[in-house]
Amino acid sequence: STSLELTDTELRMVADGRLVSAIKAYRDRTGVDLKTAKATIDAAR
């Protein structure tokens, strides 16, 4: 099963303001749709 928690790398991207990169990395890893990925990344901000 795939973890829907953010990785340290993804959290660093969010902290650096690289939201598009974080969303892409999260989607590539989890296979979720864009809306779900964006909501997850936004929640981590």
Model features per residue range: what roles?
Residues S1-R45:
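Short, amphipathic alpha-helical interaction segments embedded in low-complexity terminal/linker regions
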